[in-house]
Amino acid sequence: CIRDSEKNMKNIKKGVLPILCVLFFVFGLIMLQPDFGTGMIIVISIIGLLFVGGVSMKFFIGLGIIGVLGITGLIIIAPYRLARILSFLNPWSDPLGSGFQIIQSLYAIGPGGLFGFGFLNSRQKHFYLPEPQTDFIFSIISEEFGFLGIVIVVTLFLTIIITGFKISKNCKDLFGKYLSFGIMFQLSFQALLNLMVVVGLIPVTGVTLPFLSYGGSSLLITCLLYTSPSPRDISGS
């Protein structure tokens, strides 16, 4: 029962530990792929739900220390992750290798100007920027539609996110509240992660941009996730 779980959130052993066990199991399966970006989205989303559920700050401090050590270990055992971090700090140190994607992404965003080159007139998507239809779709949008396109995309995402959190706030039952908050936290964090990657603020993660990146099944699941809290907001059942 969600209400009983909320009462137990102050008790790490009864309320939080079972959730963490399931989380670490799922995270471990994802890392076997390996897919570090998706794993981090799930972990951060669950941590956000625990915070809303009323878990004490001492727990988050301890979890943060463990998380830093764990991420450090994952970076050490997988050299390509370290290469991504180093290329993020200085992509020009390896412009034809680990820094290639970031450099080509910036080449796409920079020349777009105010209005861009026009629809389907991108140059970087023609064998310059890898995965322009998935991870780096925002770079192509920036190149073809310029700063105006960037503003429109960011505004649409902010509208979706704000609306989703309003639904969470207005939910009449705890399950609907946690469901809508978790979904919107996941979508907003994934979008933020992707946008930060394409502008070179964080290392490449391989995370796609919700609603816009290529993939029919991904789009279908994202739309289903976003619409699922709405009936609960209306009926409270």
Regions picked out by a protein language model, each given a short descriptive name:
Residues C1-I2, Y226-S237:
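Single conserved hydrophobic/aromatic residue that forms the stacking wall/gate
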Residues R3-Q101, S139-G200:
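Hydrophobic alpha-helical transmembrane segments of multi-pass inner membrane proteins, especially
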Residues L29-I30, P111, L201, T208:
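Residue-level marker of motif borders
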Residues L89, I109, C223-L224:
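Hydrophobic aliphatic residues
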Residues I109, G113-L148, C171:
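Long extracytoplasmic/lumenal interhelical loops at the membrane interface
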Residues I202-S228:
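Transmembrane alpha-helices of multi-pass inner-membrane enzymes
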